[in-house]
């Protein structure tokens, strides 16, 4: 099937792992088969672009991949599916929020190269709690064993919010990845995200995997903060125009028909990143700085 909802085997109702602060789940068992990554970063930094291209890179390596968009804008997976797919909240509304009536094919869609796509969605702007929807989505995915029946799960998480339901992916992830650019605002957010992830790591298995430098020709400021707090850059995607064009084509970089040195380089970067993450990168335990320390550290002499 292409770009449509897909049936997934193994529907069942079993205990859940702990989700958001609003959702009680009982067990995190049964997810050992999949490598689970949570992607965070400053709003607008390119997390969805990064997540979708990384998902395809994993699929190019022969892995079964599930990408979960955790933003009310529900635009994480459109380059994979070529459309804004119905969200989990849309599907729940159709069954009057009786979660037990949903089937995987009601909210799971197949995208490019077989990547499975889910969009959590959220309430209308200014109402409700988007984080709660993320927590409920995690619960639903576990009930239907979707976090077990894949090789790789990628959570693409809203902005730099690491609280409540938006922290639910961290409670199920093996590693968190932070997308940043070589600028003050992105790095400032990165430092705060690293602190939040470290706090979660005290009670959950999640560890920081590293940093993905995005939309940046240079990485000197990223390198400076990495050295200071104990992070590392796993991949570097320069600010190539081919990335912008791929979004306008509603396409991942791997589907573009054009040929260019820039395109080949960025494809290779994602494939190398996927291979490194699959083979395993050493977990990090950074020591984030206080906000004023970041302010004093960054910039030019």
Swiss-Prot record:
Its cofactor is [4Fe-4S] cluster. GO terms for molecular function: 4 iron, 4 sulfur cluster binding; ATP binding; metal ion binding; oxidoreductase activity, acting on iron-sulfur proteins as donors; oxidoreductase activity, acting on the CH-CH group of donors, iron-sulfur protein as acceptor. ATP binds at residues 44-49, 73, 214-215. Residues 1-26 are annotated as: Disordered. Binds 1 [4Fe-4S] cluster per dimer. The keyword Iron-sulfur applies. It is an enzyme of class 1 (oxidoreductase). Gene3D superfamilies: P-loop containing nucleotide triphosphate hydrolases (3.40.50.300). PROSITE patterns: NIFH_FRXC_1, NIFH_FRXC_2, NIFH_FRXC_3. One of its GO terms (biological process) is photosynthesis, dark reaction. Its EC number is 1.3.7.7. Pfam families: Fer4_NifH. It catalyses: chlorophyllide a + oxidized 2[4Fe-4S]-[ferredoxin] + 2 ADP + 2 phosphate = protochlorophyllide a + reduced 2[4Fe-4S]-[ferredoxin] + 2 ATP + 2 H2O. Component of the dark-operative protochlorophyllide reductase (DPOR) that uses Mg-ATP and reduced ferredoxin to reduce ring D of protochlorophyllide (Pchlide) to form chlorophyllide a (Chlide). This reaction is light-independent. The L component serves as a unique electron donor to the NB-component of the complex, and binds Mg-ATP. Homodimer. Protochlorophyllide reductase is composed of three subunits; BchL, BchN and BchB. Belongs to the NifH/BchL/ChlL family. This is Light-independent protochlorophyllide reductase iron-sulfur ATP-binding protein. It comes from Halorhodospira halophila (strain DSM 244 / SL1) (Ectothiorhodospira halophila (strain DSM 244 / SL1)). The gene is bchL.
């Amino acid at each position: 099937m292409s770009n449509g909802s897909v049936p997934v085997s193994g529907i069942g109702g079993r205990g859940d792992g702990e989700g958001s602060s609003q959702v009680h789940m009982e067990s995190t068992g049964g997810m050992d088969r999949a490598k689970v990554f949570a992607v965070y970063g400053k709003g607008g930094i390119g997390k969805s672009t990064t997540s979708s291209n990384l998902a395809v890179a994993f699929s190019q390596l022969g892995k079964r991949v599930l990408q979960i968009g955790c933003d009310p804008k529900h635009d994480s997976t459109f380059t994979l599916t070529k459309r804004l797919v119905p969200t989990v909240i849309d599907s729940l509304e159709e069954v009057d929020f009786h979660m037990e009536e949903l089937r995987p094919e009601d909210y799971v869609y197949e995208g490019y190269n077989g990547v499975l796509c889910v969009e959590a969605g959220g309430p209308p702007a200014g109402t409700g709690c988007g984080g709660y929807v993320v927590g409920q989505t995690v619960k639903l995915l576990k009930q239907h064993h979707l976090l077990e029946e894949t090789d790789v799960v990628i959570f693409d998480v809203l902005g730099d919010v690491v609280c409540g339901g938006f922290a639910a992916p961290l409670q199920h992830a093996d590693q968190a990845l932070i997308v940043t650019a070589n600028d003050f605002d992105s790095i400032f957010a990165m430092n705060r995200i690293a602190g939040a992830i470290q706090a979660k790591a005290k009670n959950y298995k999640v560890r920081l995997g590293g940093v993905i430098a995005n939309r940046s020709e240079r990485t000197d400021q990223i390198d400076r903060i990495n050295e200071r707090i104990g992070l590392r850059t796993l991949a570097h995607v320069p600010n190539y125009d081919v990335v912008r064009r791929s979004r306008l084509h509603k396409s991942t970089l791997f589907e573009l028909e054009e040929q260019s040195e820039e395109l080949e380089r960025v494809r290779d970067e994602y494939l190398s990143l996927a291979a490194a993450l699959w083979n395993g990168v050493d977990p990090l335990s950074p020591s984030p700085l206080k906000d004023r320390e970041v302010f004093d550290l960054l910039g030019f002499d």
